[in-house]
């Protein structure tokens, strides 16, 4: 009986490690395919955006979350439900701007960077930039334009990984004339 109970945890750990290693292989290949880190960063953001655009449907179906009424509620859903659901972590929400339109997600441990060390010749690589694109793409699908960027990264010697999110504007549905 105890053997069965341990397998579920072991399986999740294996899946997590496989995901981390596969992501590492993807970033390595992008570094070979593109001449500089800025191009790799753009490509990771673009790939993340495309994932986010599709992932939001799965998230909404699985989480049963309704429409968020403000950016603070959106931050809570992202940190407490989305990150937990897809990465198995719960980042803390800090550094709210006075206007309530900007905050930071602090990741004590970023599962994407397990087993990773940045080479010296890739000092401007934003290794986990895929996450910024995922957040931007998913939020755009629920009519929120946001700016998302890394401001701290444990791979670059910082004590935590910090993702800064800024609300830009609500996107209005542009329906063709005569349709509602």
Curated annotation (Swiss-Prot):
One GO CC annotation: cytosol
CDD domains per UniProt: TRAPPC3_bet3
Principal subcellular localization: Golgi
UniProt-annotated location(s): Golgi apparatus, cis-Golgi network; Endoplasmic reticulum
Keyword annotations of the record: Endoplasmic reticulum, ER-Golgi transport, Golgi apparatus, Lipoprotein, Palmitate, Transport
SUPFAM superfamilies on file: Ligand-binding domain in the NO signalling and Golgi transport (SSF111126)
Lipid tethering residues (S-palmitoyl cysteine): 68
One annotated GO biological process: endoplasmic reticulum to Golgi vesicle-mediated transport
One Pfam family cited in the UniProt record for this chain: TRAPP
Family (UniProt): Belongs to the TRAPP small subunits family. BET3 subfamily.
General function of this protein: May play a role in vesicular transport from endoplasmic reticulum to Golgi.
The protein's assembly and partners: Homodimer. Part of the multisubunit TRAPP (transport protein particle) complex.
UniProt protein name: Trafficking protein particle complex subunit 3
Gene behind the chain: TRAPPC3
């Amino acid at each position: 009986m105890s053997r069965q109970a341990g397998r579920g945890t072991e399986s999740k750990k294996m899946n997590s490690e496989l995901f981390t290693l596969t992501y590492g292989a993807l970033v390595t290949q992008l570094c070979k395919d593109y001449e500089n880190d800025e191009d790799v960063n753009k490509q990771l953001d673009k790939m993340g955006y495309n994932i986010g655009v599709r992932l939001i449907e799965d998230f909404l179906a699985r989480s049963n979350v309704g429409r968020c009424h403000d950016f603070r509620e959106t931050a809570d859903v992202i940190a407490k439900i989305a990150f937990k659901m897809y990465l198995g972590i719960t980042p803390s929400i800090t550094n709210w701007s006075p206007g309530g339109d900007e905050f930071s997600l602090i990741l004590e441990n970023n599962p994407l960077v397990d087993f990773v060390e940045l080479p010296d010749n890739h000092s401007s690589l934003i290794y986990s930039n895929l996450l910024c694109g995922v957040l931007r793409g998913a939020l755009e699908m629920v009519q929120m334009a946001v700016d998302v960027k890394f401001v701290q990264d444990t791979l670059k010697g910082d004590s935590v990984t910090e993702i800064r999110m800024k609300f830009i504007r609500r996107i209005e549905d542009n329906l063709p004339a005569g349709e509602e």
